[in-house]
């Protein structure tokens, strides 16, 4: 198992304190790290920080761009969901099954749409109800046609029937992302009317049904997947990666909580290293530095590992963001267009699988793959994913905003669609060959033709967290998230004053 296994599974299975007055306000946002920090370690152990956070006026400088990206990304989830069951396609416009992780991001997007005025609270309430009612159907045994078992769901479902797609696995991380969205809705929809009360009840039932203990095939770790045909797969969730949110929810469960030793086991495989001037926990694709932060505000709170390092996980993601930008500026492999405003490697689509000669140099390219760059691993074929940079907006707005603007200027309509940023582009790949996805634009390279739900999700959520902290503030009030963080040993900041 391990972080590498996480990347492999994701690729193969599917293929600072901010202040705001609410949506639409035009005010100066001082994006700085939270003041509440653990004491710094001794000078000899003190890691080199990323450049100090800059004062960035999000609304005055980039309000229209953020509005445009946020609204179009919201429309991916709102317009493409199946109105009968709430399922959201894994990708579009290519024909697609549903991704349960994308459904979790959709559940997170709907309240954002309410606060931004895209839809009414009643419209969002009804959409969430449709979705949660579908998932709350009995899912006790892995029967043919079922969506899940033991409170967990299959990675991909048929968009129309909701049945398991082909032979995909019951997925712990994808169920986790779905449950995170459900718990966000549970806390957000807090009014006494019958519909909102039902949302709270359904989310409660779904979360309580998740049998985390059954997944401890190699205790105290949690397995990544299981199928009735082959049983548990070979990988467990070991850090550092997107599995943080999984263990927070597994530890916070009121019915089937894993022991606190699970967090210690998860963090035992952490790798702290230096990469392009930054010292931080290594994980190559940026999605692993985003996903848990969509729902959990890690500013100013730390577990035992981070207390020893003298930072928090928010700062860690900030450093990972700067390191990836540093890698793109250095551009050791000579990919076209890489630079201070064109950067960002993550799991995403790509042009083709195979080796090709480009301008006299042999190059290897991938289709969907967990791209990334770190001291631990570099997997890079010249393909940039907009979600990689945009998902880091709360961490490093001073470098993310120029990247967003550059992607708009440089790529224009070739990278931006009705539903926001297309998934990826590769300026180096300019060959006229048959492609699975996307197209080659002469003089500009390859551009994807699809948006992917699990890449659109962090875009809308992290833009909103940077602008208003909506998801963070809401989830600070969720008792299960609070309990999970405390059982993992987190202290400090907002967590110390959260209700017990």
Please provide the spans of the model-predicted regions:
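Sec-dependent signal peptide hydrophobic core
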Residues: 27-28
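C-terminal motif of bacterial Sec signal peptides marking the signal peptidase cleavage site
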Residues: 33-35
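Mature N-terminal, pre-catalytic/accessory segment of carbohydrate-active enzymes
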Residues: 41-53
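Bacterial signal peptide processing site
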Residues: 37-39
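Compositionally biased, low-complexity flexible segments
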Residues: 1-24
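Ser/Thr/Asn(+Pro)-rich, low-complexity disordered segments
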Residues: 51-500
């Amino acid at each position: 198992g391990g972080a590498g296994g996480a990347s492999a599974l994701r690729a193969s299975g599917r293929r600072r304190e901010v202040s705001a007055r609410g949506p639409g306000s035009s005010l100066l946002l001082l994006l700085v790290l939270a003041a509440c920090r653990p004491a710094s370690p001794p000078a000899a152990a003190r890691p080199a920080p990323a450049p100090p956070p800059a004062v960035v006026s999000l609304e005055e400088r980039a309000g229209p761009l953020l509005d445009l990206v946020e609204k179009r990304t919201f429309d991916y989830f709102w317009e493409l969901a199946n109105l009968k069951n709430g399922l959201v396609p894994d990708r579009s416009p290519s024909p697609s099954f549903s991704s349960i992780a994308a459904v979790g991001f959709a559940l997170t997007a709907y309240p954002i749409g309410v606060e931004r005025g895209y839809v009414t609270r009643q419209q969002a309430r009804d959409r969430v109800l449709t979705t949660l009612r579908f998932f709350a159907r009995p899912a006790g045994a892995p029967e043919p046609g079922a969506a899940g078992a033991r409170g967990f769901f299959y990675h991909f479902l048929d968009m129309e029937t909701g049945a398991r797609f082909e032979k995909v696995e019951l997925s712990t991380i994808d169920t986790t992302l779905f449950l995170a969205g459900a718990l966000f809705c549970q806390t957000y929809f807090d009014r006494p009317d019958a519909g909102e009360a039902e949302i709270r009840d359904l989310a409660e039932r779904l979360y309580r049904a998740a049998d985390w203990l059954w997944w401890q095939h190699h205790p105290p770790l949690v397995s990544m997947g299981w199928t009735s045909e082959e049983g548990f797969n070979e990988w467990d969730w070991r850090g550092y990666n997107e599995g943080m949110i999984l263990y927070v929810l597994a530890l916070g469960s009121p019915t089937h909580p894993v022991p606190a030793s699970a967090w210690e086991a998860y963090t035992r495989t952490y790798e702290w290293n230096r990469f392009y001037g930054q010292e931080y926990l290594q994980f190559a694709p940026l999605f692993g530095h985003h996903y848990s932060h969509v729902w959990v505000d890690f500013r100013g709170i730390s577990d035992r590992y981070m207390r020893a390092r003298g930072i928090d996980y928010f700062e860690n993601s900030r450093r990972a963001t700067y390191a990836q930008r540093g890698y793109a500026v250095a551009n050791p492999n000579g990919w076209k267009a890489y630079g201070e405003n064109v950067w960002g490697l993550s799991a995403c689509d790509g042009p083709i699988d195979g080796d090709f000669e480009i301008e006299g140099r042999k190059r290897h390219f991938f289709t969907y793959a967990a791209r990334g760059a770190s001291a631990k691993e570099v997997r890079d074929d010249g393909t940039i994913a907009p979600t990689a940079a945009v998902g880091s907006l709360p961490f490093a707005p001073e470098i993310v905003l120029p990247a967003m603007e550059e992607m708009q200027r440089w790529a224009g309509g070739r990278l931006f669609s009705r539903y926001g940023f297309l998934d990826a582009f590769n300026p180096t790949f300019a060959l006229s060959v048959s492609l699975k996805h996307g197209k080659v634009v002469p003089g500009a390279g390859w551009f994807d033709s699809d948006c992917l739900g699990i890449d659109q999700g962090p875009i809308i959520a992290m833009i909103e967290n940077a602008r208003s902290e909506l998801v963070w503030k809401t989830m600070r009030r969720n008792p299960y998230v609070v309990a999970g963080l405390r059982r993992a040993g987190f202290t400090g900041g907002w967590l110390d004053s959260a209700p017990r």
